[in-house]
Swiss-Prot record:
Keyword Transmembrane helix appears in the UniProt entry: yes
The protein's role, per its UniProt record: Involved in the efflux of sugars. The physiological role may be the reduction of the intracellular concentration of toxic sugars or sugar metabolites.
Protein name: Probable sugar efflux transporter
GO MF entry, a single one: carbohydrate transmembrane transporter activity
Alphabetized SUPFAM superfamilies for the sequence: MFS general substrate transporter (SSF103473)
Keywords: Cell inner membrane, Cell membrane, Membrane, Sugar transport, Transmembrane, Transmembrane helix, Transport
Amino acid sequence: MMITKQSYQKFALMRVFVFSLSAFIFNTTEFVPVALLSDIAKSFEMESATVGLMITAYAWVVSLGSLPLMLLSAKIERKRLLLFLFALFILSHILSALAWNFWVLLLSRMGIAFTHSIFWSITASLVIRVAPRNKKQQALGLLALGSSLAMILGLPLGRIIGQMLDWRSTFGVIGGVATLIALLMWKLLPHLPSRNAGTLASVPILMKRPLLMGIYLLVIMVISGHFTTYSYIEPFIIQISQFSPDITTLMLFVFGLAGVAGSFLFSRLYAKNSRKFIAFAMVLVICPQLLLFVFKNLEWVIFLQIFLWGIGITSLTIALQMRVLQLAPDATDVASAIFSGSYNVGIGSGALFGSIVIHQLGLEYIGFVGGALGLLALFWLRFITIKFKKT
């Protein structure tokens, strides 16, 4: 019996690991344009602020597609669905690597965004299903760790590959790694019938839960602020702080490394007081943005700000996702789809706001605007915390 239990634990952990790897590759490809923005703009003879709208387009496809695509795929067995998504993901990266103009690159990114829409709608609930008993919260933490490693390894390595070869090679390598992950998924995942996915009828039921709706609005607000600044952090560090490309790469690495600390803090502290944890994480996201320009030429201060910012955004993202799942246990996939859509409305809006700020005010002001949006989100958190104190 002991052998059976150990075998179960081993395979369950391996399955969680596969989902963590999947989160790694999906987050790497979503945000790697941030690390390659200047190179892509240069190759197509465009401005960074204009190319940055590619991030907006990607995010808005995800935000618009998450719920309807999840509902359309609600009855499909999950392993088969995941393998289909990875096939499209890989083909889209091949097109990215071959893109002969910006519009072809944009089209390929839309294909990737399509897979993203469904992947993040179903993954949180699936990783909890395959996790070992009594390890559900830790499994969600490992999923977040995969996302954090995308920032630690994915973005810096993507930038290094882009500098050594070119940005097209970065997308080619991502497609190759995704192929290996798909093979692991095919080998390790069990048959996963759709369960508690929810239906279209679940949507109006969830809409009647005011705290849940308040959390979705909070996600849009705080993530809009974050991406107003983060979408253009690479050109900010190079052009405003005037640090070298190597220092820029190292700062992106530090941002991702901080995500590991954020995942650890979530697993240890969230359950003790979820409301205070979310508020503290938001402060860590907001303050570094507001002070970014103030300390623009102090290298060690920028490193510290980026580290704290990375801790904040990672722990905040996991905490908000966990809160959504707690508030909608009867329709986890629908709730996750709306969460993913809300998050990507924030990403797209933030990248758009950042582009507008750059064109109208200048690159140096992105932190002030992003931080101000974050402060509005903090006030909103305070409001819903008081109004729904017993929920």
